[in-house]
Design a protein with these regions (language model features):
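Hydrophobic transmembrane alpha-helical segments in integral membrane proteins
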Residues: 2-23
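Hydrophobic alpha-helical transmembrane segments of multi-pass membrane proteins
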Residues: 14, 94-101, 129
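N-terminal signal-anchor/start-transfer transmembrane helix
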Residues: 17-37
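Alpha-helical transmembrane segments of polytopic integral membrane proteins
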Residues: 24, 104-111
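Membrane-interface helix-boundary motifs at transmembrane edges
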Residues: 32-45, 115-119
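C-terminal TM-helix exit segments that contain a strictly Trp-centered aromatic cap at the helix terminus
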Residues: 55-66, 141
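Membrane-helix interface/capping segments
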Residues: 62-91, 101-104
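Hydrophobic, aromatic-rich membrane-embedded alpha-helical segments
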Residues: 124-148
């Protein structure tokens, strides 16, 4: 059975399931940000345990295929090194899970932070959708909206 699971979850299949798996969390964040469902399942540790499991599985698969983990540190040497690393599907998938996790965490933080200022769900959905699609731009848009609700600029909240 373990071998069947291992053979089923190829890199392409893992990519499919990770992308499909985060969609319910994002839909809950966007449409039900104040619900207990959001509080218990999305803004908790739950989605990150699942994504960490996928990451650990990918590391295990990479280890079995004799992946050179030391080469990951070459990404700091230049843009050409990053291009070379991204040509490896294992590294690309590790990066993608990392990116998905950070975006989801940031979306959860935005929802929690917005509740302090009683922001409307509709207004909150705009930066969340942009965060899901573009990443940091959604956080910037939320921060700009937040300035109007908080009536001050604070870099420490």
């Amino acid at each position: 059975m373990i071998e069947q699971i291992y053979n089923y979850f190829t890199i392409d299949m893992l990519y499919y399931w990770v992308n499909l798996g985060v969609l319910p969390f994002w839909l809950i964040l966007i449409f039900f940000p104040t619900s207990s469902l959001c509080r218990y399942f999305v803004t908790s540790i739950f989605p990150f345990i699942i994504l960490s499991g996928a990451y650990i599985f990918l590391l295990y698969k990479s280890y079995l295929s004799s992946y050179d983990f030391d080469s990951n540190f070459s990404l700091y040497l230049g843009i050409d090194n990053i291009k070379e690393l991204f040509s490896n599907k294992n590294f690309l998938m590790m990066f993608w899970i990392h990116f998905i996790s950070i975006n989801l965490f940031t979306g959860g933080w935005i929802v929690k932070d917005s509740q302090k200022f009683m922001m409307s769900k509709f207004l909150l959905s705009i930066p969340l959708i942009i965060l899901y699609l573009i990443g940091p731009l959604g956080l910037l848009i939320y921060w700009l909206i937040r300035i109007f609700y908080a009536k001050n600029i604070s870099l420490y909240d």
